[in-house]
Amino acid sequence: MRNKILLFLLTFIGISQIAAASSVRDKYNFNSEWLLYVGDIPEAKEVRFQDTDWKKVTLPRPFNEDEAFRLSIEQLTDTVMWYRKHFRLPAGSKNKKVFVEFEGVRQGADFYINGEYIGLHENGAMAVGFDLTPYIKYGQENVMAVRIDNNWNYKERATGTKYQWSDRNFNANYGGIPKNVWLHVTDKLYQTLPLYSNLKTTGVYIYAEDIRVKSRKAVVHAESEIKNEYNRDKKVAYKVEVFDRDGKSIKSFEGTQTVVKPGETATLEASAEIDGLHFWSWGYGYLYTVKTSLWVDGRKVDEVATRTGFRKTRFGKGMIWLNDRVIQMKGFAQRTSNEWPGVGMSVPAWLSDYSNGLMVEDNANLVRWMHITPWKQDIESCDRVGLIQAMQAGDAEKDREGRQWEQRTELMRDAIIYNRNNPSILFYECGNESISREHMIEMKAIRDKYDPHGGRAIGSREMLDIREAEYGGEMLYINKSKHHPMWAMEYCRDEGLRKYWDEYSYPYHKNGEGNNSFRSAMTNKVQKKVDARAYNHNQDSFTIENVIRWFDYWRERPGTGDRVSSGGVKIIFSDTNTHYRGVENYRRSGVTDAMRIPKDPFYAHQVMWDGWVDIENPRIHIVGHWNYKEDVVKPVYVVSSAEKVELFLNGKSLGNGQRDYHFLYTFKDVAFVPGKLEAVGYDKNGKECCRAELQTAGKPEQIKLSVIQSPKGWKADGADMVLLQVEVMDKDGRRCPLANDLIHFDVEGPAEWRGGIAQGKDNYILSKDLPVECGINRALIRSFTTPGTVRITAKADGLQSAEISLSSAPVEVKNGLSNYIPGDELEGRLTRGETPLTPSYKDTKVDVNILSAVAGANQDEAIKSFDDNELSEWKNDGRLNSAWITYSLERAARVDEICMKLTGWRLRSYPLEIYAGDELIWSGETEKSLGYIHLNVKPVLTNEITIRLKGASKEGDGFGQIVEVAAPAAGELDLFKAKNGDKTNHELRIVEIEFKENLWQ
């Protein structure tokens, strides 16, 4: 009885708060009590239209969520659907302004309020808002209706132009309203919303300048665009108050009073120095709340709370600084949909934190959202978890002209305005392919107009020779620079199903086996008789490939010379319902599966990425498991940042591993014996610095259930979810790594099973019969709008069953409105601590600069081989006697390493002789690469080095399974698409060359 009384009081209080708008400005959750109909009914815009038989939904909710991961991306349903909502405004709202904010709809949408047409939104990517004030009925029911068409080929009505980013390869088409909706009620003198396309307003802008990291000081600025919709002048005072993460006020300041005329829009500003600041950083999501308020005659009439953070950035010398510390980018290029099976992209805010937080746990510091502006929920999530973002606007694989380019600039403008207060965004990306210099200048001007003080670099993919770009980087290849930083926009496209450990484990999948065809991302047609082994990995080979590919960037890190790589992002973090090349109908390049269960490469990256540049915390991981048949003899792979790794089996040493690619240790021909397999890492002094182990599990005996949920509990709002984890364990509680049992689930209570994913018919989407894979799986369960206890049972043949109960808490909704704002209650994570004040790297190499060069041919182009421009080259005239070039160095030096990028790097091996003066210091054939090669040469004191071709080069693609989505141009220096690009005819072609001295530590 006592609990019932308490619940009644809480409900009454919540309803009372909604019933009477008492603050100067109210933001309501507008997600509840929508109605959905799939099909086109023009009369649905009318107020009196009968919608009682429509499906009741809580937003965010795409109409085709059931298809997520069941169908391949190009098969996702596109059609017309309607959403309707009945609502009333609280008492006290009369004579106020009312705005609606949709965080995004897909694709083209017509909006109606009380039967009146209020506008169109078509880009399918960004937020949109409308002023509802002229149409609202105060004290009466209002009806909002939205007609949405998510046609893959949707075209802008005014021009007939298709949006470039509405693409069947990368932009999963979860149609309808897959993002949140908010209702804002303000005074007639108010701070505008950052929604430009429809409202033509820019909102609040918070930024910091004169940042002094060591002394914890900065000058914090606040700017608010305000509008006066009274019919008389208003003398406005602008006040700012800054609160720390605990809600404590740390600074108040104000600007000068301003008279704003009727109908006028003005920008008010204020600034003050604040000390004792905590600066936002990687893995340190320290956020402040900045409240900006408008006062008239001593009375507060409007207030906006902006959650933001402060950090210092710098971009130059090929490097990136965050809070005065150099950081090499390491992370993931993630699909903007960031989707899950059975629900698509529409998950609660805490689950976004869980997913994005896993990237930080994996020691990633950057997520590059691909092709489309990320959802605001993901952007705010990255603020909280401390994950740097590269924010796209919208594009596909090529630069564009005309209306399609204008669409891109408009979307970039809107995205910058909407997201410029989010500290985790450090990069604005203008294209997934190189754009022209003129277009780069145009995009830069947009940034300078709307975010001149945000400390963000703007660039595009590639941009190797366009100095107006503030960053760049290719896809798949390795770039270096001593000007604007270069980081790889995508690398390592290989795929691997989590289910496949190795060839020695059930289900004994032969590595690479699966298909000899895949659907082209360029034509959407199936290409047959292709080598698809790289897209059907087992987890051991998938892990090795990930190690090899990261090594290419780590080797060129800051501290290795004047020209460096600023890192790169591996393509996708979690398996995705987008373009794929493997045998499954979704992409499995993720280091986790679609339910965010880690694969082995997750732990490999955790090892390789634990540091800002250099490794700061030694780690170790044994690849795979230790449950095999008694006669198995196999290699054991260990990923570690230690200087030496020793393997022990049941306490007996098996010796030290063979080290390759710096991080990979191989122990060949290890005979399986049940028990404990341990790997111990040692530092350069022989001291143990890290340890990992695998334990043989017994036979499967029991099912274990556990729940991952919001730290604030499960909400009965019809949209919140819990993540149910199921494991098969032995009698001692150890997970059985080879278990693939089919589990049957039953759910009792007010909740909806949305399920998980596994290999099989329809990928088991929505099925309550779901197998574990490698002993584990997960499923999503969504709340109803009725609170209560939910009981879940799991059964399987031959296993002890399991049961778990959990309760959902009420969320108060009155007349379609709620004060509960998902995400507001989630706190920033401070797991990695504040930015260290120590250097992030030690110099390991120094360059010996080139003064000049003399070449056997094309002398005037010799400088192009050392001009820090990877789109230029020197080459001879194709004759062997002219295939040489001699470099004069700035000083006499004992060069012991030569780093080169040779034209056709993935196709050609050049037979070279290298001389220091007249002395031969290296002879051999260069290896094929994805960019740079390193030759360890005999150190001889000299100020002159000659590179000479000694015969025709060997030809053939060394990376035949690595392909782009878009076709490279024939003029590109990898020669991949050039006619006869693998034919050399005594050519010597050098893109860049560097001479180095190693600083032996």
PLM region descriptions:
Residues I118, Y138, V143-V185, F279-K291, ...:
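Glycine/proline-rich low-complexity spacer/linker segments in large multi-domain proteins
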Residues S22-E103, A158-F170, Y174-I177, V185-L189, ...:
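Extended carbohydrate-recognition surfaces in non-catalytic/accessory domains of CAZymes
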Residues G298, D353-P601, H605, D614-W626, ...:
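Substrate-binding/catalytic cleft of secreted carbohydrate-active enzymes
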